[in-house]
Amino acid sequence: MRYYATLGPSCCDTAALAALLRRGITGFRLNLSHTPLAARTDWIDALHAAERETGLHAQLMIDLRGPEVRIGNMPAPLPLAEGAAVTLGADIPVDGDVLNALRPGMTVLLDDGAMALTVVDGGVCRVTRGGTLTGHKSLTLEGADLRRPALCEADLADLAQAAALGVNAVMQPFVRSAGDLRVVRQTMVENGLADAELFAKVENQPGLDALPDWLALCDVVTIARGDL
């Protein structure tokens, strides 16, 4: 059995990480959705120090951005009341390819599925599951293929630095096809990560439907329930 913890502000100093190692944590995930790997070298240094202190070793996994879609910056939290109308692009900043993909009746999931909208017309949507939305949260368009590359520029930069920092596992989010994993695996090999484990994260229906095609191309499958 493996046990993972996420590196974060409350879990990033040597003492806390050493305590987690002693309690049986076998791996640490570093979420790169909001920040580059280079900005978290202090956390990684603390983890390696904790490993030396305890004599225990943990897997260090980076969770990439991948083809994930996120909303833009918002000056203030936006309350979304169930039944209310909200406009993507005007009220909620989104990229142009998102606006172009909208179709009436389409479901839009926000913040890993915590909130949901139904497209009425153009960018106008009806809130079907309310909450309070803040900037840079995830956005999923059910049934849409935005054809974004498997790895974004930030992912490529992070993978280029990963081996030198002791990373030995890579998580690819929003896996859609075998092609996605082939791209990620080849990029890992090119950056000295040939022996690192590849975790494939299923976060949408297309990825789930294609699972038989890509299952053999990864080492571990992770199910992200929020957007499913």
Model-based region annotation:
Residues 1-228:
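Non-catalytic helical/linker scaffolds that mediate oligomerization, partner binding
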